[in-house]
Amino acid sequence: MFLLIDIGNTKTKWMLRDNRSIYEHDSFLTEDIDQDHFKFDEKIRKIVISNVAGFEKEAILKIKLKNFSCPIEFIKPQKMYKHFL
């Protein structure tokens, strides 16, 4: 199982999936990121996180996720300007 997390400025969205299916998904206010939102019976193999809400939110979430004992990969969103002249 993979846990995919998108930390936005207002909402944080997450999805629990494998290579074929989505098993669970939800969202919560990013200001509540310090609460326990991630409790699963399934073994998590990897966590992938995209974050635009700043280092503090990332650090809090990192602490909350350490109990999964799996790799955590942070991907950096890229601004795209292809459609602007």
Where are these regions (language model features)?
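Short, solvent-exposed coil/turn elements at secondary-structure transition points
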Residues: 20, 31, 78-80
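Short, glycine- and charge-enriched coil/turn segments that flank and shape catalytic ligand pockets
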Residues: 20-22, 42-43, 66-69
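Gly/Thr-rich phosphate-binding beta-strand-loop-beta motif of the actin/hexokinase/Hsp70
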Residues: 1-23
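Short hydrophobic alpha-helix segments
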Residues: 25-28
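Short active-site oxyanion
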Residues: 1-3, 44-47
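Residues that cap or initiate secondary-structure elements
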Residues: 20, 34, 53-55
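Glycine-rich phosphate-binding loop and adjoining helix at the ATP-binding site
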Residues: 46, 52-85
